[in-house]
Design a protein with these regions (language model features):
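Charged catalytic and DNA/RNA-contacting regions of genome-maintenance
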Residues: 1-357
């Protein structure tokens, strides 16, 4: 099929789709988002939409499926929950003023690991996307992880032994994982149903990652963020992650907090079997029972989603003797201050649903 045999609209669609081949393209046309070709057939199968066809000039008719703009969030949610990426392509000029085909651009791409809608998020759990970079030094026995929850702005840089990747991934439960194409990193079984996205190897380059981090946090040196010269694998993972997020959000990278850096020995590594047998956050009776009967259910007296997420993190990553205690306040003063703070936080929290999100 030649480009000249297609209608101008379908030529525009093809040009945009070629830049987002790994996503289902929601192509805005008036009050509907239309999907064509393979996207239409996939959406018809997954969402139960009626599959029709559209005239394409001198070329063959193309498969077509559409959803109303007002109902689109629900359809996007269902696709993302099934592990698909969805690129939202909007009309970026007034159709009444357009000369020829209305100009359109992809304004965002929603993936399992990069989502803001409450419909796609569990308030009591983080929604992490993780980039993994194998260290070039030390025989490749160390990996650097950059984990971000764009819905809360949390960013973690984690230095881990390759052999502890399984418990680490079980703790983070990422929805999406970024790897360099051809990477030797073997993903553990605990990654569950995470979407795996392969990226070009150069995107994990440490010098580029250093520039990305400096630009993101507006600093001249990463030392103030706690990043050391030997952290090239952490920096490489962070750079790949930031570049991917920038690609998904052309209008600008989401606001991220200063990175939390985790070093080996700071927290206890709990593998999948240990987590399950101790029933820390999931019952042995199955996922359908939620957290009932678990350690989480016994300890959880949180009043806000933020507190619920933090408690879950603490249970899955208990501090070891290598973690530094908080200094500056005596134990009794800390307890009294904590009680006053929590009392006020409960009152304030009742008026806010989930401020970080």
């Amino acid at each position: 099929m030649t480009a000249t045999s297609q209608t101008p609209l379908m030529q525009q669609y093809r040009e945009i789709k070629n830049r987002h081949q790994n996503a289902i393209l929601f192509f805005r046309m008036g009050e509907f988002y239309e999907m064509f070709y393979d996207d239409a057939e996939t959406a018809s199968r997954v969402l139960g939409l009626t599959l029709t066809s559209r005239n394409n000039g001198g070329a063959a008719d193309v498969p077509l499926a559409g959803v109303p703009v007002k109902a689109a969030p629900d359809y996007v949610r269902r696709l993302v929950q099934q592990g698909f990426r969805v690129a939202i392509c909007e009309q970026v000029e007034d159709p009444r003023l357009a000369k020829g085909v209305v100009r359109r651009e992809v304004i965002e791409t929603v993936t399992p690991g990069v989502a803001w809608s409450d419909d796609l998020l569990d308030g009591a759990r983080n929604n992490f996307i993780v980039a993994i970079c194998l260290a070039s030094a030390g025989g490749g026995e160390q990996v650097g992880l950059a984990a971000a929850d764009v819905s809360t702005g949390e960013l973690r840089l984690i230095d881990s032994a390759l052999g502890e990747l399984d418990p680490l991934m079980a703790r983070l439960s990422p929805r999406e994982i970024l790897l360099a194409a051809g990477s030797r990193v073997a993903l553990p079984a605990s990654r569950h149903a995470a979407l795996v996205t392969e990226r070009d190897g150069w995107e994990f380059d440490a010098p580029l990652g250093r520039e990305d981090l400096q630009r993101q946090f507006n600093v001249l040196s990463l030392a103030g963020l706690g990043v050391e010269d030997s952290d090239s694998h952490l920096v490489g993972a962070a750079g790949a992650l930031l570049r991917y997020l920038r690609e998904l959000q052309p209008s600008g990278l989401p606001q991220l907090t200063r990175p939390i850096i985790e070093r080996p020995g700071g927290v206890m590594a709990l593998d999948e079997m240990t987590r399950r047998n101790l029933e820390l956050v999931e019952s042995l009776r199955g996922a359908g029972n939620g957290s009932e009967g678990t350690l989480l259910s016994v300890l959880d007296r949180t009043h806000t989603p933020m507190g619920a997420r933090l408690l879950r993190q603490w249970i899955l990553a208990p501090l070891t003797g290598g973690a530094r205690p908080t200094r500056g306040l005596g134990p009794s003063l800390r307890r009294r201050r904590s009680r006053r703070t929590m009392s006020g936080a409960r009152c304030r929290g009742s008026r806010h649903s989930d401020p970080p999100r």
